[in-house]
A protein has these predicted regions:
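Short proline/glycine-enriched turn/loop motifs at strand-loop junctions of beta-rich domains
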Residues: 43-49, 145-152
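The feature marks proteins involved in alpha-glucan
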Residues: 1-37, 58-61, 66-146, 170-252, ...
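Short catalytic/ligand-binding loop motif for oxyanion handling, primarily in non-cytosolic enzymes
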Residues: 200-201, 259-261, 296-299, 344-348, ...
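Short acidic/polar active-site loop segments enriched in Thr and Asp
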Residues: 48, 150, 285-288, 404, ...
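Amphipathic alpha-helical
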Residues: 602-604
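Conserved alpha/beta catalytic core and glycan-binding cleft of carbohydrate-active enzymes
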Residues: 215, 402-404, 422-587, 592-593
Length: 604
């Protein structure tokens, strides 16, 4: 018996759609071949009339409005779904639009398998927002991983932030995707996630390439493949250089407080490129190390509480502006190392925490999933898609932004399950120990991926314990880093040097002990930002004596550092004798150079 149009209506699912709670929208949207022909279905809540324009036919098909909410349907003769568009009429006008729910999938089956296995090194090419075309119509593909969500919609100014208008198609892997016509570079968006826990939250895109400037938090559609790089000579030289055998003097810097404009605010990436390159060349630095430039909501975190791992912060400009920064330094012969934070992430509602209504990126048990003294969440490195997210991100910065290396922050907190925790606040591994076995394998895999590039990229560990073989070969059980910060040397020396010379007798072993273990790792000597904040005082303030003696102590310290084996890293401002403690809220005291009070002036 021939069915009527109404017989094909799945009213419970249509109701879910109208409340933006439909898990599989392809069950009620798009065109599908049925027993009696081709069934067309669409949802335009404010439309008065919808017509189907079929390619090659002059007449349009009027769709029937099936309910008062804006669900339209039509049944036509035929066995093959034709090419078609919708002509949607509103009180304020009309528009012609393609049906996104009949388009081919952007994320294919191989992408899903590779991602599920944690082996998709370029997953950022598929997840996130990617401008493109479907059937000749320009728009943007959106894709996000939220396997436990009831439904996910993409929302933005383009649909008045109405989650009913662009519900996304769910794939078997738990990835949601959708092509949205007429959306392109510069459009802001978020994902409206109806979570497993019954809550609806607005999430920024974990794979978004650009984001609004804080305190706004939406992602921005942005193409990042159009910049024309001019650093081919640098990349060729880097590939041929063994940095373990070459001098390295690294200038650690925070872009927002290196220098400040007279009127407040920040210099742009392009402005900072000129200023940074000029200064580093003059001072003889081989590299800069940037405190995290990935998007973060809180200035006071200095970038170490990241929300947008794939987006350079919009505080200083666009992705192309940051590419220019790296490019300009490369052309000046200066390498660029990025601080990278895979150890933890913040709890901001628009971030990764409870992304789909479950602990998707973090552990469910707080004893595994939270840092109690940082108030942040810990990644579940054993989940393949989470490890893939992070490893692909590391490779992304090396590939897309030509970074010369990554300095991994807080590696010790990754390696130890009981890091910063009291008894009862952590869970032992399967062998009863405190080692995070999943994090260990994650780090080995990451470092192997970087080594496999064979392009001279470096990985550096800030690891504050005596964990063995941090820079050891992976094949021999090591973690595979190229260099490790020598925190022991730094702590011993600072404890020694702040003592008045009259009382240093019997303490000289503190400046020689480092040679006992010097060759157990590939060490990097550091006087980093961590030592000149939080009431610790500047390097100048740590020195005993009169102002002249303090400056002399600084020169002595840097001379000792230069003579000691190991690569060197110095935080900005210390090289000219910055007097005040560093703060992200103000620029360095460059006036000291002009006033003749800096160490570089020779005073003292």
């Amino acid at each position: 018996m021939k069915k009527k149009l109404e017989d094909y209506m799945d009213w419970p699912k249509i109701e879910d759609l109208e409340y933006a709670e439909c898990r599989n929208v392809e069950d009620v949207l798009g065109a599908v071949a049925v027993e009696d022909g081709i069934l067309f279905r669409c949802f335009f809540p404010d439309a008065d009339k919808v017509l189907i324009k079929i390619k090659g036919k002059s007449r349009t098909v009027i769709m029937k409005k099936m309910d008062n909410c804006g669900y339209f349907a039509a049944l036509t003769a035929g066995k093959k779904i034709p090419e078609y568009t919708y002509q949607v009429q509103y009180k304020t006008g009309k528009m012609e639009i393609i049906d996104s729910y009949t388009a081919d999938h952007y994320v294919d089956a191989m992408d899903e398998v590779m991602f599920a296995n944690g082996e998709h090194d370029r997953i950022y090419d598929k997840l996130g927002a990617h401008p493109g075309q479907v059937a000749g119509y320009a728009g943007t593909w959106f894709a996000v991983w939220a396997p436990n969500a009831v439904s996910v919609s993409v929302v933005g100014d383009f649909n008045n932030w109405d989650g009913r208008l662009h519900p996304m198609r769910r794939l078997e892997s738990g990835i949601y995707e959708l092509f949205v016509p007429e959306v392109g570079d510069g459009d802001i968006y978020k994902y409206e996630v109806h979570g497993y826990d019954g809550k609806t939250v607005m999430k920024a895109d974990p794979y978004g390439f650009y984001a609004e400037k804080r305190p706004a938090s939406a992602s921005i559609v942005w193409s990042i493949d159009e910049y024309e790089w001019q650093d081919a000579d640098w990349l060729k030289k880097r590939k041929q250089t063994n940095w373990k055998k070459e001098p390295m003097v690294i200038y650690e810097m925070h872009l927002g407080s290196f220098k400040k404009p007279m009127g407040g605010g920040f210099y742009t990436y392009r402005e900072l490129a000129e200023k940074t390159a000029d200064y580093c060349k003059k001072m003889g630095y081989t590299h800069v190390e940037l405190m995290p430039v990935m998007e973060h909501p809180l200035d006071a975190s200095w970038g170490y509480q990241v929300i947008g791992y794939y987006a350079p912060t919009s505080r200083y400009g666009t992705p192309e502006d940051f590419m220019y920064f790296v490019d300009h330094l490369h052309q000046a012969g200066i390498g660029v190392i990025l601080d990278w934070v895979p150890a933890h992430f913040p709890k901001d509602e628009h971030g990764l925490g409870r992304f789909d209504g479950t602990c998707l990126y973090e552990h469910l048990d707080k004893r595994q999933g939270e840092h109690p003294h940082w108030g942040t969440l810990i990644y579940n490195y054993g989940r393949p898609q989470v490890a893939n997210y992070l490893i692909a991100n590391a490779l992304f910065w090396l590939e897309q932004y030509h970074a010369d290396g990554l300095r991994l922050d807080a590696v010790a907190s990754m390696l130890y399950l009981d890091y910063g925790k009291q008894d009862g606040e952590w869970i032992a591994n399967m062998y009863g120990g405190n080692e995070n076995l999943e994090a260990i394998e994650f780090l080995k895999k990451l470092n192997q991926k970087i080594k496999d590039r064979r392009d001279g990229s470096l990985s550096i560990a800030e690891e504050s314990t005596a964990w063995p073989m941090v820079t050891g070969n992976i094949e021999e059980g090591g973690l595979g880093f190229d260099f490790k910060w020598n925190m022991g040397w730094m702590n011993d020396y600072l404890e020694y040097i702040k003592t008045d010379p009259l009382f240093r007798k019997g303490r000289h072993g503190m400046i020689t002990f480092s040679m006992v273990y010097q060759y157990s790792e590939n060490f990097m000597l550091v006087f980093s930002h961590d030592e000149v904040v939080h009431m610790k005082g500047s390097m100048y303030q740590k020195m005993p004596g009169t102002p002249a003696q303090k400056l002399a102590g600084l020169r002595q310290s840097f001379g000792y550092m230069a003579a000691h084996p190991g690569k060197k890293l110095l935080f900005m401002g210390q090289d000219f004798g910055q007097i005040s403690e560093w703060s992200e809220e103000r620029g360095l005291d460059w006036n000291l150079l002009a006033d003749g009070k800096a160490m570089a002036s020779g005073t003292g």
